[in-house]
């Protein structure tokens, strides 16, 4: 059920995901879905949990054996590629999710991988929450603007700005104020 809902989100947008739309896709009646998910919020949280697991796997593969600037670029590129290839799933991560997704192993994996990335910088662990918020807002903000076409009518193209933004993040993380 969750996999089909995620595919629906990727094909038609996250807001298109409803219990009835998923039921139609599965060629079943909507009430039969309630044996799998409690309600629409649980369905959406299931997509978020799936997205977190997929994203964690991509980040893990991308940053393995890397540190510092190289790891940061790989980390950000993994996010960007995921957002492009799985837009509905990525959108599921841009909302407040329920406790099940927040406390999932996949969420813990993403946090741990982000922590591993940050160990390549001179940032005390007590500052990590601030850095994680900066990374999330910068990367996801850029991806959201890019996805919505906000950069379509200006030069240079977003492909030129992306590495510069990640380099700017690297410079900031390398000189993080404590």
Task: Identify the residue ranges that each predicted region occupies.
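An amphipathic alpha-helix adjacent to DNA-recognition modules
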Residues: 2-6, 10, 15-16, 27, ...
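Short, hydrophobic secondary-structure boundary micro-motifs
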Residues: 18, 90-94, 151-155
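Key DNA-contact positions within bacterial/archaeal DNA-binding proteins
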Residues: 29-31
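Hydrophobic alpha-helical connector segments
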Residues: 46, 60-91, 98, 107-111, ...
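Amphipathic alpha-helical packing segments from all-alpha helical-bundle domains
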Residues: 94, 98-125, 129-133, 158-171
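N-terminal hydrophobic signal/anchor transmembrane helix of membrane proteins
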Residues: 54-57, 63-65, 71-82, 161-178
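Append "Primarily bacterial transcriptional regulators
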Residues: 17, 21-24, 33
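Amphipathic C-terminal alpha-helical segment
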Residues: 137-154, 171-178
């Amino acid at each position: 059920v969750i996999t089909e809902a995620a595919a629906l989100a990727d094909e038609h947008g996250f807001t298109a995901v409803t219990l009835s739309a998923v039921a139609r896709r599965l060629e079943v009646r909507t009430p039969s879905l309630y044996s799998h998910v409690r309600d629409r919020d649980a369905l959406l949280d299931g997509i978020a949990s799936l997205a977190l697991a997929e994203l964690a796997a991509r980040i893990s593969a991308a940053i393995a054996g890397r540190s510092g600037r190289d790891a940061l670029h790989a980390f950000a590129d993994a996010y960007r590629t995921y957002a492009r290839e799985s837009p509905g799933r990525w959108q599921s991560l841009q909302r407040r999710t329920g406790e099940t997704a927040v406390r999932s192993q996949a969420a813990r994996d993403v946090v741990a991988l982000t922590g591993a990335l940050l160990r390549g910088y001179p940032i005390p662990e007590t500052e990590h929450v601030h850095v994680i918020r900066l990374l999330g807002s910068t990367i996801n903000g850029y991806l959201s603007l890019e996805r919505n076409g906000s950069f379509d009518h200006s030069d240079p193209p977003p492909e030129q700005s992306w590495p510069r933004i990640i380099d700017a993040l690297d410079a900031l993380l390398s000189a993080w104020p404590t």
